[in-house]
A protein has these predicted regions:
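C-terminal transmembrane helix pair
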Residues: 86-94, 209-217, 221, 225, ...
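Alpha-helical transmembrane segments and their membrane-interface exit regions
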Residues: 21-27, 177-182, 301-302
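Hydrophobic alpha-helical segments of integral membrane proteins
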Residues: 17, 21-24, 28, 46, ...
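Hydrophobic transmembrane alpha-helices that form the pore/transport pathway of multi-pass ion
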Residues: 1-53, 57-75, 265-297
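Alpha-helical transmembrane segments
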Residues: 27-39, 111-128, 187-196, 309-327
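Membrane-interface segments at the starts/ends of alpha-helical transmembrane spans
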Residues: 75-89, 163, 238-242
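Hydrophobic transmembrane alpha-helices of multi-pass small-molecule transporters
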Residues: 85-234, 333-339, 343-355
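Membrane-interfacial loop-to-helix junctions in multi-pass transporters
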Residues: 1, 28-42, 134-137, 170, ...
Length: 355
């Protein structure tokens, strides 16, 4: 589910795995409201959230990374986060979080899984997926190549070809989209790999315009002429100046966890960035590691309240299978685990990898 959310589509795991789980629960006699199905359905959403911030070249991650570059440029010292290093940190944090949360569920929450003994593996084969057609194979191969063109410039920045790719990444994205709209390997329907009309109808325009508006607003609010950066620096510098670097990181992560589950995660990410930039730039601290962690954590931990993220809203909207009290109980537990892990694993790993 995490990898699917990262590289296929952020909502795909929930739309795919929840119906599969419903069928399995019905087949083996698990009732609504039992502990095991409640935890499993929430875990699918948690894994989806952990995969959501992974790709630095799309979605809210791209919006926040680009916004921070604009903020720091307005402050006189542009900070560009390395895409490959960011991706590595996000993947490691996601895998570790899933492993620890699953172990926590197994040995601490201990739901009754005895009915799983009645599961017939053949049931899962009743509706097999059809083989990939030419368009789907082309999409799979070309998408891997596209991801590499986005990440390799961060890994090999001194090569001239990589410098060319880095400067022209928007052109590459447009060219790749145009290629998908023109190529057709479908021998039956003769549709292009990317049917542009259908994609336009299904595109998340609301999220797109929200990201666009947030980036523009963030650049305006952090411009030197507004005085907001100077104000934040004046207010927060006395608070953070007495802290060690690690304690500064921990304080920011705790504040982020609280805010992202009250407000929208993207908005909170935008609000935290001027604070980080103001303090780090004035103190001579490399802000790339903590900024990367904040971006990953603010998007991944937004699970407790419906306003935190669309994924949290989907959890709370599943009234048929999930009760509000159970949702708050388990998501708060998982959020605390994620906080502990981002401090214990994320901080040292990001500090070592992101320069």
């Amino acid at each position: 589910a995490m990898l699917m959310a990262a590289f296929v589509g952020p909502f795909s795991p929930i739309f795919l795995f929840w119906p599969v789980l419903y069928d399995i629960f019905q087949e083996i006699g698990i009732e609504k409201g039992e502990k095991y199905p409640t935890i499993m359905l929430i875990l699918v959403a948690i894994a989806t959230l952990l995969g959501f911030p992974v790709p630095p070249y799309s979605g809210n991650s791209l919006a926040l990374i680009g916004n921070y570059a604009g903020i720091t440029e307005n402050m006189g010292s542009k900070v560009i986060i390395n895409n490959a290093a960011y991706l590595a940190v996000a993947l490691v944090y996601g895998f570790v979080s899933i492993a620890v949360i699953v172990l926590f569920c197994k040995y601490v929450l201990r739901p009754d899984v005895s009915k799983l003994k009645n599961l017939d593996v053949e049931m899962l084969k009743r509706n097999p997926l059809p083989p990939l057609n030419g368009n789907q194979k082309f999409m799979a191969v070309s998408f891997v190549i596209y991801i590499l063109t986005m990440l390799l410039p961060s890994m090999l920045p001194k090569l001239k070809i990589m410098q060319f790719l880095s400067v022209n990444n928007y052109g590459i994205a447009l060219g790749y989209t145009a290629l998908l709209c023109c190529v057709s390997l479908d021998k039956e329907k003769h549709e292009p790999v990317l049917p542009f009309g259908k994609v336009l109808n299904g595109f998340a325009w609301g999220t797109f315009f929200l990201c666009t508006a947030a980036i523009l607003l963030g650049s305006v609010l952090t411009n030197e002429s507004t005085g907001i950066s100077a104000f934040l620096n004046t207010i927060l510098r006395p608070v953070f100046s007495s802290m060690s670097l690690v304690m500064f990181y921990v304080a920011l992560l705790v504040i982020t966890l609280l805010l992202t589950n009250i407000c929208n995660s993207l908005v909170v990410g935008m609000l935290m960035q001027p604070v980080i930039a103001s303090f780090c730039l004035s103190s001579g601290i490399n802000s790339a590691p903590i900024t990367s962690l904040i971006i990953i954590f603010v998007l991944a931990s937004a699970s407790v309240t419906p306003s935190a993220s669309p994924f949290a809203a989907m959890i709370h909207g599943n009234k048929e299978w999930l009760k509000s009290g159970e949702i708050y109980k388990y998501t708060m537990m998982f959020a605390v685990i994620e906080l502990v892990l981002v401090i214990a694993v994320g901080i040292p790993f990001a500090t070592a990898l992101i320069r």
